[in-house]
Amino acid sequence: ISSAASDVYKRQLAPMNENEYISRLKARDIRPTALRLLILRTMAGFDRAFSLADLEEELDTVDKSTLFRTLTLFLAHHLVHGIDDGTGSLKYALCSSDCDCEIDDLHTHFYCTHCRRTFCLRGVAVPQVGLPDGFSAETINFVIKGICADCSGRN
């Protein structure tokens, strides 16, 4: 069932066929094994940012350490980015194909306090922050917390 919040998230990621999954891995210098392709396909199927536990639930035949190692590899090669949404569990989301996870590529994330889903809002830029002399940002985590479109329709 499609929902308003899920639709916003899905519009940001174009559907891919098998060759596109392979190309996406190769473009990030990741060897496309059957397991990595399975994990990437599963990630692309989520309508929100996902946790390691979410992947475990979807891929119950793959052990947790393999999933964790694959996520770590995908993070290192900028295939996914990590999101600290304040829940204590790191979430992940697929990067767009032109993302290098540099400061200019950053976008806002939204955490719904009602349904506890986290969404990438790729069209919403992270606000510019002026830093004092001598300070330089390496990463920025900008999370808005509130009620998503799905949950606000239920209230």
Range-by-range predicted roles:
Residues 1-12:
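Single conserved hydrophobic/aromatic residue that forms the stacking wall/gate
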Residues 15-37:
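Short alpha-helical segments that sit at the start of domains
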Residues 32-34, 46-51:
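Short capping segments at the starts of secondary-structure elements
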